[in-house]
Structure formats: structure tokens, C-alpha cells
């Protein structure tokens, strides 16, 4: 009997960031398709090793900046869910980096797109998240969402944990007033870079306030999780930031490759 794996669980990629062979951090990424090209999406702070607000190194002990990314991708020609390790060089000795940043806000949008080469694309079974779901679902404050990531690493399967949360700020303020939506959820560092989806069952409301009924779930990708808001005490507020999904196409179309 074949395993029933949710298609959204196949969109994510557990990643390890390293400087040569020195481990720096673990995080989450996911795949995206645009103009017949494939990209890996994650946070700027993951690949740079620096805080986007202060530009300080996140690792206070080593001040290391990643130059390699190791990810577990779905492999072509294997059973669904079988993962294949791939190493991507994300920074050259010259300082040139592989990732694209937002053309206007740059690192102030904590999201990057890493173009994936043809040799990698030929061996990977891609499940780009922007080719799934229903873009017309209504998104409002108080609704439940799921953060799909790896708080404890890839585990035995390489499939993500679905961490439940709720939208804690007005989503319509993005991007006019705020650059991100707040979500109420407890998370761990390995969740940085996770896709966040809205999922409703059976009865669904569209942006035009029309009600539809289906026998299963409807889904909408709403953005990229980048961790909790900084507070003096990590227990003070379990509030995280989700950068709007609309930024991803802007990053790819802008084609701005940041110098490290």
C-alpha cells in the first residue's frame, strides 16, 4: 500500500549551512518555479549568517558566514518522499554570492532566491509550492496557518513538521504599512525559511467573500517564516514574522545578486 504524503510536505527542503566543513546552522527552504526556472527560497539571515537589521554575525562565537548549503531534495526516479542530499556553493572566495535579494529593499526583506543549475534540476523531482493551492482564499487576522519546517532537523524521513499558528496582525497592511505579517506560534531556529500556508477544510471563503464547498482541503501559500520577533526574554512573546509571498517573484524578476 503506497504511503499517502501531503503534497505540501514535498515542497520543503531541510538545509544545513556550513563554512567549508564547519557546521554553522540548520534551517528550512522550499522550491519555487518561475519562467521555467527553479529556485530555492529561504531567509537572508540563513545564507548570510548575519542579522538583517544590525548586520552583526548571528554566531557570536565563530562569526562564520556560510559558503556552502547542503539540502535534502526529492530525487527523480524513486518513490515519493525519497530524499537526495545535494551541496550548493552559495559564496565564492571573491565574496560573490549565489542568492538574489529584493531589488528595492534588499536585505530588509529577509528572503532570498537561489537559482538552481540545470545539472541539479535534471536529477531532482521538484514540487514548487507556487504551483499548488488556491490563490483566491481569503486571508484574515485570527485565521489558523501552518509553518512547515524542521525544528529538530530532517529526522528519518526528511519531511517537515507542520507547526500550527494563527495570524496575529492585519494581513492587508502588507506591503503598504508593514513588510511582514505576524503569526502567533512557538518555534525553534530550524524553522527559519519555512513556507507558511493557510489550509481550510470542506467550506472555503474566497477573497470576494464567496463561499465554496469541496470534499477536501483548500490551501494558500501566504509567505516565508523568518523566526520570532526579538525580545529580552524568549518567553515574552511567541510571535513570528512571515514575509509576504508577493516578494518572491519581485526578487526573482529583479535579478539583484548581492555582493557578500
Which residue ranges define each predicted feature?
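Cytochrome P450 catalytic-core helices
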Residues: 42
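Compact nucleic-acid interaction/catalytic patches
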Residues: 48-58
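Serine endopeptidase catalytic core focused on the charge-relay Asp
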Residues: 10-17, 25-26, 33-35, 56-178, ...
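Activation segment
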Residues: 50-51, 171, 252
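C-terminal subregion of chymotrypsin/trypsin-like serine protease catalytic domains
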Residues: 5-8, 46, 198-260
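Long protein-protein interaction modules used by eukaryotic assembly/scaffold proteins
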Residues: 2-7, 32
